[in-house]
């Protein structure tokens, strides 16, 4: 949209790895992100973005990115089927074995 206007453009960078920004336009595009230094040398991010779809609905994604990777959350993202009962039971057995100190080499 060539006629979109910037409504919000806020940026705060403390210079020590901590930052926050927020950006919004008149055509419904919005993003915000906060960053902090991580305990394992990584940067930790938490944020969201949204934008209008052609049908007029709004697509929105929230996320966390840290030592565990990028973890998005949105109604737009596909969800896999649940694990079958036998797989869930095997995972429970494996967790019990880990707690007992049992390892397999």
UniProtKB/Swiss-Prot annotation:
One of its GO terms (molecular function) is structural constituent of chitin-based larval cuticle. Arthrodial membrane. GO terms for cellular component: chitin-based extracellular matrix. Keywords: Cuticle. Residues 1-21 are annotated as: Disordered. Residues 16-81 form the Chitin-binding type R&R domain. The keyword rRNA processing does not apply. InterPro entries: CHIT_BIND_RR_consensus (IPR031311), Cuticle_Struct_Prot (IPR050468), Insect_cuticle (IPR000618). Pfam families: Chitin_bind_4. Coiled coil: none annotated. It comes from the Eukaryota. PANTHER family: CUTICLE PROTEIN, CUTICULAR PROTEIN 65AU, ISOFORM A-RELATED. This is Cuticle protein AMP4. The lineage of its organism: Eukaryota, Metazoa, Ecdysozoa, Arthropoda, Crustacea.
